[in-house]
Amino acid sequence: MGRISRADILPIGLETAARNLLHSCGTLRGMSTPISLFDRPGVEALRKELRLDPTVIRRLRVDLLKHFVPDAEGLASFPAPDRLALHTLSLYHRSDSEIDGATKLLLKTATGMLIESVILRVASGRTALCVSSQVGCAAACDFCATGKMGIARNLSSAEILDQLLIAGQLLASEGRKIRNIVFMGMGEPFHNEENLYTTIESLTAPDLFHHPPTKLLVSSVGVADAMVRCARRFPTVNLALSLHSVRQEVREQLIPLARTYPLDQLREAVREVNALTRSPVMIEYLMLAGRNDSLDDARELSDWVSGLRVHVNLIPYTPIDESPHLVGSDKPTREAFSSQLKAAGIDTTLRYSLGQDIAAACGQLVRHENRKRAMGSSESSRP
């Protein structure tokens, strides 16, 4: 990947000013601000203004949001293409793994901030898309590169949806379709809760993407009350909890947010989610040598999930420069841990992490230059 300049990520104050300037310039010139394709009321108002038959908009959405045709093809029969904004993001760079089916998309917002999405092509033929919900992340997990850069801002619903549109168009050219969408990219989804819910509504809406809610997965480091709210509002959407330890002191070392949401509160949240939904909650467990990977840890995890409807996903750790003190468990340790859980009757999967050669694996969703720039901005803004 080409080197990213320091101008590629803007501090939040500069980004806000840039957004306001863009809006002001359009207003001063008397220009009509293009309507986002995802803005249903706005598109309907535009249709009435242009006196278009409803089938024109319906066909446009089918072509772009269900078949993912190229922009020019999708807009070919639309009489005022300059009045519609198909994208809020632009593709800045694409990196394809040479060892597996992962593709990292580096995307730029209208004001120059960078986010990432990752396409995961599984050997079985299934394709998943990992999307970001924020620029950076406030959770500050010790094992995560994104958390080390701090938080710049939330992504809008249109910016989250555009990750799917861009990736879908890319995959359509390969004859592939996105089957699963996982909110496991940059950011804690429940720190952007309302935009997350708006996004889910658009993803599943019959007149937009019409993506099955059962093929959506929202992963959280443990915002307990929001997990329950999400399950109540979207009972067929899957939820995942990044647990990583059932020892409170260890979890607090790995995930500072654990001080706000202790383990007993998380367990109660999983129990409530189980009562509201049919699918098990995925328990994500990063395997760290000497931290959480002993057979005693496995037994304690078995006890913690006992009586809950869960599926444990054991994840190999991908090292990051900022946390040299963390080391991933070796394969025999991971396998012994998995066997211990299975012997206790716990549904368990040993996950293989894709995209490590292109820094696309979970925890690597920001390049070193991005992290350095973001952390520098954070330090300079402190009193």
Task: Give the label of every model feature segment.
Residues 95-97, 132-133, 219-220, 242:
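Short linear Ser/Thr-Pro motifs
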Residues 14-115, 271-280, 285-383:
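Auxiliary Fe-S-binding modules of radical SAM enzymes
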